[in-house]
């Protein structure tokens, strides 16, 4: 059976203020920009493939006080809608958010300058997770390969150029992380690093818990550490996206939850690519106090 046009690999990216986004998102831009945030909204913000599902499950378990049964009420992508998601005729992310009771936990991959203005005027809380650029690039490549609603990434070498030029969906990694980092002290933003979460998950989970205004017993925190481990989540059909149709995510090409490690970039970057990337990285990150761990 032929795929519907919107599900084919011919999906195009269109730009909004210089940021490439998926065509249906751009077509729904007016609804996204007029979204009405609420003061008690918590927005999970990430560049793609930076630990979004992981932090989402952590937040979910904290919200439910570590109650595993309550956390299993539905698949993870239905719990916290992505504000900019649009894939007609399905309900948009805005539609889903509008139907949720307060307090809401929502998600976005948007850079700060494209966020609906009501988030800023309502002084919402933002939970940002950043992942080092090299691992992020590799993970996003494999996601691009399996995600049938994104353009074909081509070869690794071709995709390498696309990524460093910021021509992937949701734009430049460099601009994204710098944009959120630069405003972290002006708004209620908890800025976390994927690598810190791998190194000491309990410590980082406790930061999130405090940010959410929760005070859970240590044994509950230990339970959350266990339940949100990569191994547990990879085997959990409620978190591993295995319920998504193959016409959207073909996990026979690459699993949604692939490795979840720090330093996998070394299995992909050539010596020449690594040297070139380091030069570009130094130029683009010049002047920022952001520091990333590239391997543990």
Swiss-Prot record:
Binding site for substrate: 107-109
UniProt-recorded name of the protein: Sulfotransferase 1C2A
Domain of life: Eukaryota
GO cellular component, one term: mitochondrion
EC numbers, comma separated: 2.8.2.1
Annotated PANTHER family: SULFOTRANSFERASE SULT
Compartments it resides in: Cytoplasm; Lysosome; Mitochondrion
Keywords assigned: Cytoplasm, Lysosome, Mitochondrion, Transferase
Family to which this protein belongs: Belongs to the sulfotransferase 1 family.
Catalytic activity: a phenol + 3'-phosphoadenylyl sulfate = an aryl sulfate + adenosine 3',5'-bisphosphate + H(+); cholesterol + 3'-phosphoadenylyl sulfate = cholesterol sulfate + adenosine 3',5'-bisphosphate + H(+)
Binding site for 3'-phosphoadenylyl sulfate: 49-54, 131, 139, 194, 228-233, 256-260
Tissue specificity note: Highly expressed in kidney and at lower levels in stomach and liver. More specifically found in the epithelia of proximal tubules of the kidney, of the bile duct, of the gastric mucosa, and in hepatocytes.
GO biological process: sulfation
GO molecular function annotation: aryl sulfotransferase activity; cholesterol sulfotransferase activity; sulfotransferase activity
Cytoplasm in keyword set: yes
Function: Sulfotransferase that utilizes 3'-phospho-5'-adenylyl sulfate (PAPS) to catalyze the sulfate conjugation of phenolic compounds. Does not transfer sulfate to steroids, dopamine, acetaminophen, or alpha-naphthol. Except in mitochondria, where it can add sulfate to cholesterol producing cholesterol sulfate, which alters mitochondrial membrane organization, and impacts protein complex mobility increasing state-III respiration, thereby modulating mitochondrial respiration.
The encoding gene: Sult1c2a
Active site: residue positions: 109 (proton acceptor)
EC class name: transferase
Taxonomic lineage from the root: Eukaryota, Metazoa, Chordata, Craniata, Vertebrata
Gene3D superfamilies named in the record: P-loop containing nucleotide triphosphate hydrolases
